[in-house]
Amino acid sequence: MTVAAPAKVQYEAVIGLEVHCQLSTRSKIFSSSATAFGAPPNTQIDPICMGLPGTLPVLNEKVLEYAVKAGLALNCTIAPYSKFDRKQYFYPDLPKNYQISQYDLPIATHGWIEIQLSDGRTKRIGITRLHMEEDAGKLVHAGSDRLSGSSYSLVDFNRAGVPLIEIVSEPDIRSGEEAAEYVQELRRILRYAGLCDGNLQEGSLRCDVNISVRPLGSQTFGTKVEIKNMNSFNAIQRAIEYEFNRQVKAVEAGERIVQETRLWEENSQRTISMRKKEGSSDYRYFPEPDLPPIRVTEAQKTRWQAELPELPGVKRRRYQEVYGLSVYDARYLSDERNTAEYFEAVIAAGADPKAAANWMMSDIASYLNTHKLDYPDIALKPETLAELIGLIEQGTISSKIAKEILPELLEKGGSARALVEAKGMTQISDSALLGQMIAEVLAENPEQLQQYRGGKTKLFGYFVGQLMKKTQGRADPKLANDLLKQHLDG
């Protein structure tokens, strides 16, 4: 009697993300010190953010406004009443030895965003909560990128007290791709709303991953592991893929997953153990006694909601439904607010949406990438691009001529029509004149003409090239082809 081998267990990842976003305010959350990135160490500090005795925090009103706007943009319920709490822990970059955060009454809860995956599917990811807190300082390690292995460490307190919102997702994410797209969509939304610049390299947007594995179909959560130190979207995806495989191998080998914090090492493309993961009880939260409770009125919510721009998800759908753009084109053009605003200005100036999209996604995108520029940096105004597209549609110039003059318009601006006229580049659409030029081309190439009329019709392209050369590329392509065909076959 034979016994069939048991089927191999399939596992799935259960992933939740904690995304910390520095708000784009000019001053810190509880004091007036500046928040600019890149200032010399310890030049943007004050007694409050350094936790000196006798100082009292005062909430920056702009932080509350930005936090509520973020909650509204993420479809959250805004709490009419919330409060700050002290989160106790000891680390060199935390001068007070506690962080002012929010624990049981956050400013926003129960939100969601939709992400779009590479296979075209959309998925809704829930947001558990959004809360305000202050950032810590930054440790700079000599001789290593972390404390282990460094000869000594210095502390830059410029970042201490910079306002943060922490956005905690539901454990709805199942892959590295979904996680990376979720963070990218969060970044798009916050950048559109002008709340955070979303620069991962500068640390203004930081993501911690909580991941566990379980048999596919199981409803029981496994032991979660936290991953830190990912400073790109690709790093988030790779770290999750590595950690998922590590945990599956450990489970299959009968090992116990330890609840811990692990560090993503970019050079070795692996996670390494950093420390035991703390629980909320380890932080000994209690209400912040130096700050009053926060109240958000309906009037404030209504005003701040009205100040939000059209967000990228809504814009993508509108581009597809109103302008007939593809999913890819709509996504590209709505990805950054500067791009979307330029595109809409071109359309407002009278350009065909699909033609505007084609120019922006090809020649202009190539120019921007080559010169590391953005739309506000170029001299080509939206009205001029619309004018250029109009000249092509009117038959005044060909697409080839438009591509030739585009670099000058991008660098110097000005009128497309005036430039075409100054250079004498208007399209030749006179049938009689083109017919005369075609006759000259045929007379200059008797051997090729004889071969063509002898059956070698592939030479048609040769004659097109000769005609374009004679007209300096100014011949109306369709008219030129039709007339050339008539002369060759006549």
UniProtKB/Swiss-Prot annotation:
Signal sequence, start to end: none
GO molecular function: asparaginyl-tRNA synthase (glutamine-hydrolyzing) activity; ATP binding; glutaminyl-tRNA synthase (glutamine-hydrolyzing) activity
Oligomeric and partner information: Heterotrimer of A, B and C subunits.
UniProt-recorded name of the protein: Aspartyl/glutamyl-tRNA(Asn/Gln) amidotransferase subunit B
Protein biosynthesis listed as a keyword: yes
Superkingdom: Bacteria
Function description: Allows the formation of correctly charged Asn-tRNA(Asn) or Gln-tRNA(Gln) through the transamidation of misacylated Asp-tRNA(Asn) or Glu-tRNA(Gln) in organisms which lack either or both of asparaginyl-tRNA or glutaminyl-tRNA synthetases. The reaction takes place in the presence of glutamine and ATP through an activated phospho-Asp-tRNA(Asn) or phospho-Glu-tRNA(Gln).
InterPro entries per the UniProt record, alphabetical: Asn/Gln-tRNA_amidoTrfase_suB/E, Asn/Gln-tRNA_Trfase_suB/E_cat, Asn/Gln_amidotransferase, Asn/Gln_tRNA_amidoTrase-B-like, GatB, GatB_C_1, GatB_Yqey_C_2, Gln-tRNA_amidoTrfase_suB_CS
GO biological process, one term: translation
Originating organism: Synechococcus sp. (strain JA-2-3B'a(2-13))
Annotated keywords: ATP-binding, Ligase, Nucleotide-binding, Protein biosynthesis
Catalysed reactions, semicolon-separated: L-glutamyl-tRNA(Gln) + L-glutamine + ATP + H2O = L-glutaminyl-tRNA(Gln) + L-glutamate + ADP + phosphate + H(+); L-aspartyl-tRNA(Asn) + L-glutamine + ATP + H2O = L-asparaginyl-tRNA(Asn) + L-glutamate + ADP + phosphate + 2 H(+)
A Pfam family the protein falls into: GatB_Yqey
Family: Belongs to the GatB/GatE family. GatB subfamily.
Catalytic activity, EC: 6.3.5.-
